[in-house]
Amino acid sequence: MTTGSNGPQDETPEPGTPGGPGPFSEEEIAAVTGPGPADELDELEAASIEEDSDEAPPDLETSFEKLLSKSRKLSTDRIRTVIESVLFVAERPLSVDELYMATGIERELIAEALNQLSGIHRDGISGIVLYEVAGGWQFRTDPHSGEYVRRYLRVKPQRLTRAAVETLAIIAYRQPVTRPEIEDIRGVDCGAVIKALMDRKLVKILGKREEVGRPILYGTSREFLEFFALKDLSALPTLREFHELTQEHREIVEKEDKPAPPAAGTVEALSDPAFTKRMEKSAAASEAALEDLEEAMAAADRTQKVSSSVLDTTPPEPETGDTTGPKPE
């Protein structure tokens, strides 16, 4: 303490000066000022990460019993829209059981909703068609709009080579089948083709046959049914259906190849009937005259041959008695 003209004064040295208190620590500063922006961000990020890792989305916490009780209160139209929404976001065909586990709606009501949706989203009516494929249900674009969809997406259509189609057909109709059996039918090596089909997930290994060498058994996959839009393997066309389909196509081609009747206003319709009849008579007369001319020429040819045989004075060749010698060639 010092005494000045204005009275006694306390002199407190500045922090850090000799004889004064030391500088404030970071803990002391934080206790007075609070956490800085960076500290607040770190705390928020840690809390957010902890919440995301411990807590699940509220929809997944809903028990299946509550879902069942809620689904019983849904109207028929609401059930249809729920099933439609779930199928729309699904990446693969969903079965009735999978739809039941996702929605809690009774299977009978799901089947009715699928029947209604099949009538709404059908080929030729809607751009989105509901198909029953691979044991489930799936929304797909209208096949008649495929060209425009591919053009927008800029993707090439998936095509199979002739060898791949033949091999895949043998596997589909003869499964489970071994590679030697496939090659015995096709008559060529099929190893590369089978590998290509497996890479495209159209064919899978079903196991091994219990015989010498334990050859691998091949069969079609779920992706095969999805690729060809088949409900199951029983939907494959039979040989009888193939012949009927071939005959139907043949009749369609023959029907399309028939000449069309002349349209009104054409040259055939505007021609003079009397002139047409005269031309037909003239053509018939020309044909008759041509036949008479051909007969006359044939008769003249016969007469000439007879005259030549009568006027022929060439003496016959003398006969030789020597039959043992070689004849001149």
Swiss-Prot record:
UniProt region (Disordered), positions on chain: 1-39, 252-274, 286-329
Knockout consequences: Conditionally essential, the primary defect in a double scpA-scpB in-frame deletion mutant is in chromosome segregation and organization. Cells are temperature-sensitive; they grow slower than wild-type at 25 and very poorly at 32 degrees Celsius. Increased sensitivity to DNA gyrase inhibitor novobiocin, cells are longer, and contain 2 fully replicated chromosomes that are not completely segregated. ParA, PadC and bactofilin BacP are less organized than in wild-type. All these phenotypes are stronger at 32 degrees Celsius.
Induction statement: The 3' end of scpA overlaps with the 5' end of scpB, indicating the genes are cotranscribed.
Keywords: Cell cycle, Cell division, Chromosome partition, Cytoplasm
Subcellular location: Cytoplasm
Main location per the UniProt record: cytoplasm
Keyword Zinc part of the UniProt annotation: no
An example Gene Ontology CC term for this record: cytoplasm
GO biological process per UniProt: cell division; chromosome separation
InterPro entries associated with the record: ScpB_csome_segregation (IPR005234), WH-like_DNA-bd_sf (IPR036388), WH_DNA-bd_sf (IPR036390)
Role summary: A conditionally essential component of the chromosome segregation machinery. Required for chromosome condensation and partitioning. Important for positioning and anchoring of ParB-parS complexes (ori of replication) in the subpolar region, and of the ter replication site, as well as for segration of the ParB-parS complex and thus chromosome segregation. Probably acts via the formation of a condensin-like complex containing Smc, ScpA and ScpB that pulls DNA away from mid-cell into both cell halves.
Family: Belongs to the ScpB family.
Protein name per UniProt: Segregation and condensation protein B
Originating organism: Myxococcus xanthus (strain DK1622)
